[in-house]
């Protein structure tokens, strides 16, 4: 396949060439697409049935069960089926409220309302300029204390271990070692209806089409064997290096999950 380690000068032509090669490799593209569409429809119906019955759609895991190692195989399977989870009791309520208060004091102390000029990228362009729901603040004491807590490390290790991170003698990442990932503050006042985030897919689309590592990650998709594709297989994901382009929001870190605390 015509992969590219660096971004080609005419990346649009390169993607067209890749798509032609993939179509030839897959064969009956429509049949594969129809099969996947039917599978997605079945999953959506499953979710709608649960919602109508007032049952839980995404799994909720008490932090205590993670700390004590009592999360069941059924709960782990539910997280992998949904691709997300809610962890409750991660921090005491009093601690969370204290961090929230300290964060507001940090904003006031640094004159946030006077110096804030907008989100700085297109993901949050629809938010209000003053006191937004998502703040471009990364290193406040509240954020750092949460990131560096033992509780956070325990949850990250638990979630990382849901991935298939080692196979054939190769370890793709260490599930018990996480890099502190700085991200914004999200603070939604009661009654907020805005989702705060524009629709987007993290990591570059160019790379998904053209990088050799991504061709390995999605090999079973690109050869039409979608039944063999395991989205929890970390193989080759840590080999992905995004192209050097003028983009302020890119990052080479492999994030096993993304969440809000």
Residue ranges and their predicted role:
Residues 54, 74, 79-82, 91-261:
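Non-heme Fe(II) oxygenase catalytic core, chiefly the N-lobe of the double-stranded beta-helix
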Residues 1-81:
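Fe(II)/2-oxoglutarate
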């Amino acid at each position: 396949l015509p992969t590219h380690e660096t971004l080609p000068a005419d990346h649009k032509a390169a993607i067209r060439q890749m798509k032609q090669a993939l179509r030839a490799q897959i064969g009956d593209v429509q049949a594969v697409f129809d099969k996947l569409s039917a599978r997605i429809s079945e999953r959506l119906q499953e979710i709608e049935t649960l919602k109508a019955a007032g049952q839980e759609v995404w799994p909720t895991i008490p932090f205590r069960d993670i700390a004590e190692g009592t999360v069941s195989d059924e709960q782990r399977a539910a997280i992998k089926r949904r691709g997300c989870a809610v962890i409750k009791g991660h921090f005491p309520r009093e601690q969370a409220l204290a961090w929230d208060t300290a964060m507001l004091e940090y904003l006031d102390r640094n004159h946030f309302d006077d110096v804030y000029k907008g989100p700085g990228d297109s993901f949050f362009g629809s938010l209000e300029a003053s006191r937004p729901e998502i703040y471009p603040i990364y290193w406040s004491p509240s954020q750092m204390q949460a990131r560096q807590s033992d509780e956070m490390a325990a949850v990250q290790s638990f979630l990382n271990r849901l991935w298939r991170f080692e196979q054939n003698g190769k370890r793709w990442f260490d599930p018990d070692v996480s890099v502190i990932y700085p991200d914004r503050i999200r603070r939604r006042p009661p009654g907020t209806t805005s989702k705060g985030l524009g629709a987007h897919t993290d990591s570059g689309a160019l790379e998904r089409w053209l990088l050799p590592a991504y061709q390995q990650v999605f090999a079973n998709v690109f050869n039409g064997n979608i039944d063999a594709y395991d989205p929890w297989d970390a193989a080759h994901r840590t080999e992905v290096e995004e192209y050097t382009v003028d983009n302020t929001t890119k990052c080479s870190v492999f994030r096993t999950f993304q969440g809000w605390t």
